Amino acid sequence: MTQMPQTNARVHAGRMAYHAGLSAEASVIREYESHGYVFEAQRWRGQVGEIDLVLRKSGLVVFVEVKKSKSFERAALRISPTQKRRIFATGEEFVAQEPQGLLTDMRFDVALVDAAGAVQILENALSEG
C-alpha cells in the first residue's frame, strides 16, 4: 500500500471538506425552501468576508452560517467571535445594496448539519447583544 505525500493528502482533505460543505449548504437551502424562503445566494463574497447562504422571505433578508460536524453540539462550537463579527459586517455590506439599505429587515441564523445529514436551524442565533 502506498502513502500519499503529505501535500497530496492535504489537497484531498481540502477537496473533501469543500464538497462536504457544499452538500451541507444544499441540505440547508432545501430546509429553508420547505418553509417558504427563497434562495438568493450561496457563498456571497464581500470585501470583509463571506456569507454561506442568503435567503429571503416576506421582505426579510436571512443570512445563514452553515456549520457541519459529527454532532450539532460540535458544529455549534465552531463559530468564533471573530467570525461572528465578520458575518455581521458582510451582512451589512450586502444590505447596503438594498433599496432600504441598513434599514432592511435582516436576521442572522446558524444552520447546523450533523454527520447523518440532519439539519437544525437556529434562527437569530448570531444576534448582536
Swiss-Prot record:
GO molecular function: nucleic acid binding
Pfam annotation, one family: UPF0102
InterPro entries with a match to the protein in the record: Restrct_endonuc-II-like, tRNA_endonuc-like_dom_sf, UPF0102_YraN-like
Matches recorded under Gene3D superfamilies: 3.40.1350.10
Protein family membership: Belongs to the UPF0102 family.
Designated name of the protein: UPF0102 protein RD1_1191
Organism: Roseobacter denitrificans (strain ATCC 33942 / OCh 114) (Erythrobacter sp. (strain OCh 114))
